[in-house]
Amino acid sequence: MLNSRWFNMLTENELNALITKADQSDVKAMIKLAEYYRSINELDKAFKYVHKSTLYSYPEGERKLGYYYEKGIGCDKDLVKARQYYELAAMHGDIKAKYNIGLFYYKNNQYPQAFNYVKDAADNGYGKACALLGYFYEHAIGAAQSFELARESYLKALEQGEKGLYHRLGILSYYGNGVPQNIDEAFNYFYQGANEEEKECYYYLGVMYSKGEGVKKDYSKAFYWYQQGANSGDVKAMYNVAIYYENGIYVPKDLEKAKYWLKKSAAGGFDLAINKIQIDNI
């Protein structure tokens, strides 16, 4: 039995059978071998089999080879070749490649090209592309800003099983961006996200419990969610935890803890915390 995280039941005979199939031009076997060798960190062999699959114009192999070149897996990093193979796979109809090259262009600040590729992938039902397209619409990246289209794209992404989108939908509903403001709906989105450990939702739940928005006012629950957010690295939540300790809201007044969280928030770049430290000479 081989030590493999990917094929945890792969035997020597099964490995040899895959190698034989790959030698007989079976491109799916080549990709399986590449994934296997990558899982055991034999990256030269992984690269070899991914590259071999592209000789047969196999779109999945072309996309994966683009990724290998982009990340330098089993080869020197080469962004020119990465883009070439992503484009080749996209030309051969690989939807994920269209998303990958869109993401590639986005990282390189080529926003119109990024938008076009991501939208193409999203229009073909790829969930990750739907999520990114929503972000593009929300923030006017490569296209005119449209909160309504952002919301539609986020909902499509959720339907495809994508995670990490409840805070985006919650924010749109909370502020009335693209839809009439709906505080109850916003609370439900944030709560769903928090239940899936979507850390961006913790702060907003704290705000809504502290103000009684969409739910009965409850400082104990507000503090709980602020603390969850602070523990997850949210500088706004850290600031509010500091304020609660400073003023004894729900928790006993504790100036040392207040200073601790205030300084952490300021270190994270939160302006209110930075200003408060300067004003209070902390």
Regions found by a protein language model. Give the residues of each.
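N-terminal segments that cap or nucleate solenoid repeat domains
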Residues: L2-I40, E60
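Ankyrin-repeat and related helical/solenoid repeat scaffolds used for protein-protein interactions
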Residues: Y202-K211, K216-L272
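Hydrophobic face of amphipathic alpha-helices that form TPR/SEL1-like repeat modules
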Residues: M30-I40, E62-K71, C75, K98-K107, ...
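Short helix-capping/linker turns of helical repeat alpha-solenoids
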Residues: Q24-D26, Y56-P59, K71-I73, M91-D94, ...
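Terminal, low-structured helical/coil segments at or just beyond the last alpha-helical repeat
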Residues: L2, W6-L10, K264-I282
